[in-house]
């Protein structure tokens, strides 16, 4: 069951991803509506992700300005700490730990704190485009869209909590 629902949800996520790239329809209103509905149902803040993903494509492989999956540099303190830790526990154990951490914590950490982003932007938050988080990723003209994304995800979370209260947490987790 989990494989079937995960595959279906991934398919919906891919359609929303295409909407975020502007590849779903020649009508912007349609692709933003479809993308917003699908991503929001999957607890992804559509417009926030649309913006950060565009920056990711514009700055891929840039060691300071990259938006996601920016490696720690050996010439910086956090990179030296990472290398020392990897050396201490071994390459295989470090790889297993890194993969586990990315799969369990990576997406929420990225959305809430800009984890894996480049150092030039500071900590960002896909739900809160203003202080105390860095606002470079979401210029003022994006704020209304970020707040719309936040509201949508909040509504879906509230519906899930209400469903869990009514039907039980197990029933909601089995969706």
What is the role of each PLM region?
Residues 13-22, 53-57:
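Active-site recognition of the HExxH zinc-binding catalytic motif
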Residues 2-5, 18-25:
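Short, functional N-terminal and low-complexity linear motifs
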Residues 12-15, 25, 45-50:
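Short, conserved acidic/polar surface loops in the N-terminal third of protein domains
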Residues 1-12, 31, 35:
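Conserved donor-binding loop and adjoining core beta-sheet/short helix segment
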Residues 1-8, 40-174:
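Non-catalytic, topology-defining segments of multipass membrane proteins
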Residues 25-39, 69-73:
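Post-HEXXH active-site segment of zinc metalloproteases
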């Amino acid at each position: 069951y989990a494989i079937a629902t995960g595959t279906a949800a991934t398919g919906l996520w891919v359609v929303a991803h295409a909407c975020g790239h502007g590849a779903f329809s020649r009508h912007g209103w349609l692709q933003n509506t479809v993308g917003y509905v699908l991503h929001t149902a999957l607890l992804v803040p559509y417009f926030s992700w649309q913006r950060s993903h565009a920056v990711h494509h514009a700055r891929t492989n840039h060691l300071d300005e990259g938006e996601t999956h920016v490696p720690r540099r050996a010439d910086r303190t956090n990179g030296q700490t990472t290398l020392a830790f990897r050396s201490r526990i071994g390459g295989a154990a470090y790889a297993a730990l890194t993969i586990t951490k990315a799969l369990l914590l990576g997406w929420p950490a990225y959305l809430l704190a800009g984890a894996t982003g480049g150092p030039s932007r500071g900590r960002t938050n896909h739900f809160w485009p203003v202080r105390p988080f860095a606002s470079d990723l979401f210029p003022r003209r994006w704020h209304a869209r970020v707040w719309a994304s936040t509201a949508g995800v909040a509504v879906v979370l509230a519906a899930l909590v209400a469903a869990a209260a009514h039907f039980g947490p197990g029933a909601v987790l089995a969706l």
